[in-house]
Amino acid sequence: AVQASARATSERLQVTNNDHWLACLPLAHVGGLSVITRSLITGTTLTVIDGFDADVVSASEATLVSLVTTALQRIDPSLFRAIVLGGARPPADRPPHCIATYGLTETGSGVVYNGKPLNSVEIEIRDGEVHVRGPMLLRCYRDGTSPLTSDGWLPTGDLGFLRDDGSLHVEGRRGDVINTGGEKVWPDDVERQLIQHPDIHDVAVTGLPDNEWGQIVAAFVVSARPNLSLDEIRAHCRAQLPGYALPKQLELVEAIPRTALGKVRRSELTV
């Protein structure tokens, strides 16, 4: 499975003997470890650094690197031939050689690059949930149990759909969707609008329980402005979002809880 993942990703990236991988993500996560396995299996040059440092990354002379979105904003992307992005959803206006990936630990790293499955990877949507099948899937967990169906498919727990051109659009984790007044709101959609506000440095959106609406859209915001108001952020989003998706609660916080790969820990967004 590890070899299949390394070969499929290397083929999509058109890796050659002249390439040089840089590993700067935590090696305890599949996003970091997979850089090591790709280099070992393809024989490319490898540099490993202890954590992300913008200056060290920029001076590495590597051609390939795997990053999270927040790290991308701190370097000059043109220094690399290709940048593989994981973790939080990357910006839509990223440079063309910055590749948005989709995958899980169970898939051995990304199996969908810029919406297109890697060779030997199959994608199906069953009841709105993304299912993946391919030779890079895990055999089982350490306790011997397997998440795979009898015919080899992995239910990912992510909801999404296939576009007309066959590319995959992932909406988010099944448990992340906010049900407010009978309408469904995806946190990512609201976050993409809020982060464009000039006084918002970081943001995460979640659903909080509400007696009237079932759930309300709540925005947790990092801002240097202590007087940033709910009315202001609602007005900022109003032209791009339907009324039911506008935040009904604003919480100003010092930091957004995130994983080492930049994903929001939504379970920790509480008041």
Regions found by a protein language model. Give the residues of each.
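AMP-binding/adenylate-forming
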Residues: 1-74, 99
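Short, well-ordered beta-strand segments
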Residues: 20-22, 131, 220
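General small-molecule cofactor/ligand-binding pocket signal
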Residues: 47-49, 99, 124, 250-253
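Gly/Ser/Thr-rich phosphate-binding loop
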Residues: 63-67, 71-117, 122-124
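Hydrophobic/anchoring residues in structured secondary elements
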Residues: 85, 205, 251-252
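Short beta-strand-to-turn element immediately C-terminal to the catalytic PLP-Schiff-base lysine
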Residues: 111-115, 126, 133, 163, ...
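Conserved ATP/PPi-binding loop(s) of AMP-dependent carboxylate-activating enzymes
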Residues: 117, 126-151, 167, 173, ...
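AMP-binding/adenylate-forming catalytic core of the ANL superfamily
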Residues: 134, 159-245, 255, 262-264, ...
